[in-house]
Amino acid sequence: ALNLNARNFEVELRRAAEKLENGMSGFLTQPVLSAQAVGNLKKARETLGGRAKILAGILPVVSQRNAIFMENEVNGIHVDETIIQKFEGLDRAAGEELGLEVSVQAAKAAAPYADGFYLMTPFNRVALMERLIARLRTEVTD
């Protein structure tokens, strides 16, 4: 794992380098849901170079309640406050639509620094993930 949201990302990078020295060949990141996470992903790519594959985590946020829960209760996940605010007052359909857009934008921002993505399905919403995969295939990947 590579926690892009670690309070002291330099320590996280040192741990990643140690993991590489001990045979690690790739990393899965925490979900990319902030500019800080993208910046740390860039720093990880620069520091670790081509020595390891990095798969950026993409987890669609589907409601304000979901975003607040992840921000406050899930260790290692940081949801940018602007994202949390955008979900205010949205119904389920609008929340899913916004979550889809946020996820596509996060993937676009992370793409230059990642070797690929791994997707986390929120609340068994398979149809949402099908839509996300289709968008990523046409808008983000080659």
Predicted stretch roles:
Residues R7-V11, P31-T47, N124-R135:
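Active-site-adjacent beta->alpha loops and helix N-cap segments on the catalytic face
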Residues K19, G23, A56, F117:
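Conserved, mostly hydrophobic/aromatic
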Residues S25-A35, E97, Y118-T121:
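Catalytic beta/alpha-barrel core
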Residues A1-N5, M24-T29:
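Surface-exposed cleft-lining segments at the edges of enzyme active sites
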